[in-house]
Regions:
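Glycine-rich flexible loops
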Residues: 1-166
Length: 166
């Protein structure tokens, strides 16, 4: 897929996420690998109003190559890609219901959601709860790395999900 098409796809996905109420305001971010780096939604962007030309393009050390300044949570995406090299995309949201689950008392941090359906078990397996870190705290990347090798989805306490896929 061309970088131009990938940029359009990120914007379409962002709009879909926003229209379904899974993101509001300037919350959440989406990234995808391209031939010579990766694309990420810019800092402060609204997923419902993304501009393909303004997406951030970064190298594999997190250095901005072109576009607007990247989300301050770029390090989360990079941590997922480093641990899950076969995955081509990462989505991080602050969706209301997932944040609500992330603050519940008495949940099993090894698997925060019970296996409600067979499909959930087949697709997700278990969903670990990553302890709370302040937004932008680089220690969060290391905490995510600790789970990402075995899980393509994690739930950040008081924050929201990070999911890697193709």
């Amino acid at each position: 897929m061309s970088e131009s098409q990938l940029r359009e796809d990120i914007c379409r996905l962002g709009a879909s996420i926003y229209e379904r109420g899974l993101a509001h305001g300037s919350t959440g971010n989406v990234s995808a690998k391209c031939d010579d780096g990766w694309l990420l939604t810019p800092t402060g962007s609204n997923l419902g109003r993304l501009d393909p030309a303004r997406l951030s393009k970064l190298d594999w050390k997190g250095k901005l190559l072109s576009g607007d300044a990247p989300s301050k949570e770029a390090f989360l995406h990079l941590a997922m890609y480093e641990e899950r090299a076969k995955n081509a995309a990462v989505v991080h949201l602050h969706s209301t219901h997932s944040v609500a689950v992330s603050v519940l008392e008495g949940v099993d941090p090894a698997d925060v959601l019970p296996p409600l359906t067979a499909y959930y078990v087949m697709r997700i397996g278990s969903l670990p709860l990553v302890p709370y870190y302040a937004p932008g705290d680089m220690a969060l990347a290391q905490a995510v790395r600790g789970f990402a090798g075995k899980h393509h989805a994690v739930l950040l306490a008081n924050h929201g999900p990070v999911v890697a896929g193709s």
